[in-house]
Amino acid sequence: MNVTERFLRYVSYPTNSDEQSESCPSTAGQLALGAALAEELKAIGLTDVEQDADGYVYGYLAGEGEALGLIAHMDTSPAVSGENIKPRTVRYKGGVLELGASVLSP
């Protein structure tokens, strides 16, 4: 699986937050993404991979250097739906990037 395929898979999970929820994480979609990430970490050789009750994913990669932590959140804004996302991939060739009715200009 290449990096584009991975990211397209990640955005398929409905991970928007639920501001009314008192649990952590606030939605089942966030737990599901965490579980998928844990499986990927195992598949690429990390050990002691686990997802705790709050959805945090941990793994260990043996090495000789100092420890390094990579931290990111898995939730997205509750302002828009996280369901039925239809990502668009564009091979960027420089210049202005058209985004529907708007543009992204370097």
Predicted ranges, named:
Residues 22-75, 85:
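A non-catalytic alpha/beta surface segment that caps or lines the substrate-entry region
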Residues 10-13, 56-60, 92:
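Sequence-level detector for tyrosine residue identity
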Residues 2-28:
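N-terminal capping segment at the start of a domain
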Residues 11, 15-18, 41, 45, ...:
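Structural signal for hydrophobic packing residues in well-ordered secondary-structure cores
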Residues 1-2, 106:
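Solvent-exposed, charged interface segments at domain starts and junctions
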Residues 66-106:
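Active-site metal-coordination/substrate-binding segment of hydrolases
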